[in-house]
């Protein structure tokens, strides 16, 4: 299972999750196993699902677009489960608080590069997903 989290209250992850799960059903049924393989969580929760404020998050000095495994290794966070968690920050900080444009704040290239690095040989669906994401209408 992959858990995608964003660090804003925006909903770009919802579109991402919709597209990725749709393609996972087609391209990697064994990995999908009948359940959603990717879940979007509020980025202001820690690994155990405990609420964390933006201020607390900044105090942990978590780098933008950091892989959760890297943060665990640096002891900046603790892992409550074995899910692969990818922490993604909005890459256009000046747009984060523009409500009507929040869905555009996730850089698809950053998402895909992290997924490729994290999934390794299992990333064959990512290339297929790129076109699917465009068709669903997410940011490119």
Region roles according to the model:
Residues 2-45, 52-140:
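Domain-length accessory/inserted modules outside core catalytic folds
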């Amino acid at each position: 299972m992959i858990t995608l989290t964003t660090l804003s209250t925006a909903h770009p992850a919802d579109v991402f999750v919709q597209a990725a799960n749709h393609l996972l059903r087609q391209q990697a049924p064994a990995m999908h196993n009948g359940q959603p393989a990717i879940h979007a969580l509020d980025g202001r929760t820690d690994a155990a699902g405990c609420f964390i404020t933006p201020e607390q998050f900044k105090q942990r000095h978590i780098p933008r677009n950091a892989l959760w495994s890297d943060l665990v290794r640096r002891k900046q966070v603790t892992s409550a489960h074995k899910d692969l968690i990818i922490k993604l920050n909005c890459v256009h900080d000046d747009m984060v608080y523009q409500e009507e444009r929040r869905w555009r704040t996730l850089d698809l290239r950053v998402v895909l590069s992290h997924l490729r690095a994290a999934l390794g040989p299992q990333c064959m669906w990512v290339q297929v997903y790129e076109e699917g994401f465009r068709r669903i209408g997410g940011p490119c």
